Swiss-Prot record:
GO terms for molecular function: growth hormone activity; growth hormone receptor binding; metal ion binding. Disulfide bonds join 71-183, 200-208. Residues 1-23 form the signal peptide. Keywords: Disulfide bond, Hormone, Metal-binding, Secreted, Signal, Zinc. This is Somatotropin. It is found in: Secreted. The gene is gh. Belongs to the somatotropin/prolactin family. It comes from Cyprinus carpio (Common carp). Zn(2+) binds at residues 38, 192. Pfam families: Hormone_1 (PF00103).
Amino acid sequence: MARVLVLLSVVLVSLLVNQGRASDNQRLFNNAVIRVQHLHQLAAKMINDFEDSLLPEERRQLSKIFPLSFCNSDYIEAPAGKDETQKSSMLKLLRISFHLIESWEFPSQSLSGTVSNSLTVGNPNQLTEKLADLKMGISVLIQACLDGQPNMDDNDSLPLPFEDFYLTMGENNLRESFRLLACFKKDMHKVETYLRVANCRRSLDSNCTL
């Protein structure tokens, strides 16, 4: 009888610990989604401020540029379209999100310079810090998803082909400034989508529609 009580106590403690971890992970997921939503909204505001500062003819010219433009993050392997995103595992979506956020940590220091006379960004270090905080949160979620298993992602320590891809942008160059902002908005939209689907995957919901 005593052994049964001890066993039941161990099982109960284990369940409580697992519930606590699940609750912590859910809070982390919710926080990550909120943070990337804020970054996506900020990116949209920045590009709107930039476009508002342009002459009508400049706007028409730039609207034709970005659909044909290349972003450095295009080198990061990611799902092609909604169907593939919905079929991707939670771990895969978290890893892609991690790499996308990581790719902007350094270039983000140049972002505020692309929007003149705007209070959208404020201190450029704040944007970099927001990205670093989100990256750290996603890293914790990845470790929780691995649950003690080794990280087999071979791309974790691989830099993008052009680490300084964005560094020449944003300084007295209309096209490149627009391209920088458009790429940032595009990538934050990707991360927001991936984290939303990953969060849905975690809840075992089979209807993770976009």
